[in-house]
A protein has these predicted regions:
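Acidic, glycine-rich A-domain
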Residues: 268-406
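Extracellular/lumenal glycan-associated context and N-glycosylation machinery
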Residues: 1-65
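A generic local structural motif
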Residues: 5, 231-233, 318-322
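An amphipathic, basic-hydrophobic helix/alpha-beta surface used to engage anionic
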Residues: 45-295, 332, 336, 350
């Protein structure tokens, strides 16, 4: 229906244009004289140009969008966007309005006018312009189309076209450099060490020793055995294997972006330490990552954190009850939330008894205090053997140092 209305308006304007030309010619014929013909010939170039423009296809234009950088963008970075407009036919145009339609995800920081320019092509076939996006927010931003608009000098003929051109921009969360340290679980009865598995690194031989029952045949050091006439086996370096499970609360919160930033910081710190980790993130698009280590795991987790949204309608305490049991017991559990609730503390206390180490990181906005109820729940958590650490952004660096001292 909308297309039909636009088509009818275009036809009407063309008919009016021919009518004006006919009226100007008729006036000159009947009136005669220099002035009448001067007005007619003065109007003719504009009239003929309007007729030409009415039949000029804007489909002749191609529009490209390029970014000065991509792939390594983080929250808060700036970006330069270059828009290139090209066409095949060099028909003169008085003006051309080009608008790079801003995604809704950038509407708060990027006014629509920022991506719009008025160009004066004349006979040019190629034009460019640039605009900047400052302080990119975390997330997936999809640029999908351009709007082109031109017209004649008298404002009678106007032509518009939407050019589809998709460009995806993924902005990863920023992070704070921090040092991850293995934690200890403290109960009223005393202190118990965290469950750290000791594994032999069979690629690193530290020495030889006499054979012991249970040693594998592949561990036998044949040269040492031949020299001593006693079966000798290789001695390997022992490495700590510390598994961590991060649970991200995705219920809507004013401090959600800070939570994501802190989560990215600890993901980087844990994997950099050489430990293995997994993540649970439940919302409209649930995500559960098995416990692994390495660069690929970090890429997966950062990709998820770049796109994650605060869209969970389920309290984090209930999620813990239903989801965490699928993971092995000997893990350190780090729960990241913005609010301390009774249900969360009770569920965390249950897992603390089974798993040994549970830490609740409560992320608050700058100068936002802990509520009275939250303070009471914090005492309850301590009695159940659960660490609770309230953090504001400047304190992220010392998150694990302070927990260790708690």
């Amino acid at each position: 229906m909308k297309k039909n209305i636009v088509w009818i308006k275009s036809i009407t304007k063309i008919v009016l244009l021919f009518l004006f030309i006919a009226l100007a010619f008729s006036y000159s014929m009947f009136q005669g004289g220099f002035v009448s013909w001067f007005l007619f010939y003065s109007f003719m170039p504009f009239g003929l140009y309007s007729v030409l423009l009415a039949f000029y296809p804007l489909g002749d234009f191609t529009v490209q969008r390029t970014f000065n950088r991509s792939g390594d963008l983080k929250d808060g970075d700036s970006l330069a966007v270059t828009v290139t407009v090209e066409r095949n036919n060099a028909i003169p145009l008085f003006f051309l309005i080009v608008e790079d339609v801003v995604p809704e995800t950038l509407a708060d920081i990027l006014p629509a006018a920022r991506g719009k320019r008025v160009l004066f092509p004349g006979f040019k076939r190629k034009m460019k312009y640039e605009y900047a996006i400052k302080r990119l927010p975390r997330g997936e931003h999809i640029f999908s189309e351009f709007k082109l608009k031109t017209g004649d000098a008298i404002g009678l003929i106007e032509k518009e076209r939407v050019v589809s051109k998709q460009s995806d921009l993924l902005v990863y969360p920023s992070y704070t450099d921090l040092t991850y340290r293995t934690l200890e679980s403290r109960y009223d009865q005393g202190t118990t060490s965290s469950k750290v598995k000791i594994q032999k690194d069979t690629t690193m031989v530290s020495g030889v020793r006499e054979y012991l029952p249970g040693d594998r045949v592949s561990w036998v050091h044949w040269k040492a055995t031949a020299k001593t006439n006693t079966i000798m086996t290789k001695e390997f370096e022992e490495k700590e294997s510390h598994d961590v499970l991060v649970v991200l609360d995705r219920t809507p919160s004013k401090s959600f972006e800070l939570m994501v930033k802190f989560t990215a910081s600890i993901v980087r710190a844990i994997l950099k330490r050489g430990a293995q980790m997994g993540m649970i993130s439940i919302g409209e698009t649930p995500a559960s990552f098995p416990i692994r280590g390495g660069d690929f795991q970090q890429q997966q987790l950062f990709y998820h954190l770049a796109k994650v949204k605060p869209d969970s309608g389920i309290p984090i305490g209930k999620i813990l009850k239903e989801e965490v049991n699928y993971f092995q017991q000997s893990v350190t559990m780090l729960i990241i939330s913005s609010e301390l609730t009774q249900e969360l503390v009770q569920t965390a206390g249950y897992h603390a008894k089974r798993r040994g180490v549970v830490v609740l990181f409560v992320i608050k906005l700058e100068k936002e205090p802990l509520g009275k109820e939250e303070a009471a729940f914090r005492e309850m958590a301590a009695a159940r053997g659960v660490h609770v650490k309230v953090l504001h952004e400047p304190e992220f660096t010392y998150a694990f140092t302070e927990v260790r001292r708690a």
